[in-house]
């Protein structure tokens, strides 16, 4: 690898280019997202996975919302033993590129065989000490989650180059990603089904998906409900719809989105 890159200087330049001073934590995460996807793709570790979720919208479809974690569908035969090289791959690449302390925590138990009785999500947590001289700042943490459920659609898309400070080769990286229609189905299912917290970012994404021309595919939604073993969906959906006026009024939606969209987008969309 070429000489090390100073991560803090990279972040500062990305923030300056995009006028993103209020979003430093998610800009840091996004730069690391690019690194992680690039090194895993180069190592052939993404071949059996399909990128999904909010970060896939941001990095493959140019969504205006920043994201935190990397989510993939691995299919029913997935087990985390398939990705045994992931830890070393990420630690070596990020460590060598930035000279920072990087640790990857693997799933507690590597499953030798897939379990069909329930949805299983394996999580890797990546921790990067982005400012070693600042003991008061927390480490940057990113989760990679792979669920043993299928993706029913896919397309191949290049990573969107959101910053000119990124290496040229990053935007040549081809990622297998769900179609907008399937991401919409995922989010329609998860938005009302998560009862212990409100998924404000899913609200934003669903509106954005509609603006991009994505449509509701009833067959995909039905299949997702089966995959995730969700009951009483219509009741949960109606309850969530009924609660939307209060969700908007109480202010938590606005506060959440301030952390994930540029101030220019916030001012034109939510103020």
Give residue spans per PLM region:
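Structured mid-to-C-terminal alpha-helical surface segments
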Residues: 1-49, 60-63, 75-271
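Anion-coordinating catalytic cores for phosphoryl-, nucleotidyl-, and glycosidic chemistry
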Residues: 66-67
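Glycine-rich beta-strand-to-loop/alpha-helix junction loops that act as flexible
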Residues: 52-55
